[in-house]
């Protein structure tokens, strides 16, 4: 395709705009600085007259659209329907206070919290008015206590603390379990003679350990022993 097609196409685009400059004087390299062209004179004056209006605050373009479109002036905002809600707010809040704004029962909240709260043995009350219940031991705790009792019928204070921490029990629970276990063992070996009743199967406890355990038991004689565990 020849290049003349593009030239004719471009020329046809600018021919329509050439009519805008029909009144313009022929251009030249030298023209008077103060001369006013007839083709641009009217347009320049119109542009100069419209530009101040665009940036004039008092221009109709800057007027509030509510004044013409919605019939609301600058002072009409105080008469909006929202003002009527201010008078009804106390009534609405009073109605909400009777219903959803009421505080829930504190007992119900504490009951739900206590249901999901795990109580450990050391957290229970130990006052004189507390009703003592029978302590239940897990199979793991019972097995470990039986293993310890097999080697030592009496525990020292240090060993009792170690077992209490290992089995998540209190020292008093360990002490009572060993007391009940010794009573049960004595009943089982009552008719077997003094030799069998001296010590269980295994090593005989040392004299120091026995004396320390007996002293600890004497200090806690005022505590009530629980029922023998089956």
Swiss-Prot record:
Short motif (Antp-type hexapeptide): ranges: 119-124
Bias (Acidic residues): 216-230
Gene Ontology terms describing biological process: angiogenesis; anterior/posterior pattern specification; embryonic skeletal system morphogenesis; negative regulation of cell-matrix adhesion; negative regulation of DNA-templated transcription; negative regulation of keratinocyte differentiation; negative regulation of leukocyte migration; negative regulation of monocyte differentiation
Pfam families listed in its UniProt record: Homeodomain (PF00046)
Molecular function GO terms recorded: DNA-binding transcription activator activity, RNA polymerase II-specific; DNA-binding transcription factor activity, RNA polymerase II-specific; DNA-binding transcription factor binding; RNA polymerase II cis-regulatory region sequence-specific DNA binding; sequence-specific DNA binding; sequence-specific double-stranded DNA binding
Biological role stated in the UniProt entry: Sequence-specific transcription factor which is part of a developmental regulatory system that provides cells with specific positional identities on the anterior-posterior axis.
Compositional bias (Low complexity): 194-213
Annotated compartments: Nucleus
This protein's record includes keyword RNA-binding: no
Protein's UniProt name: Homeobox protein Hox-A7
Keyword terms, alphabetized: Developmental protein, DNA-binding, Homeobox, Nucleus, Transcription, Transcription regulation
Domain of life: Eukaryota
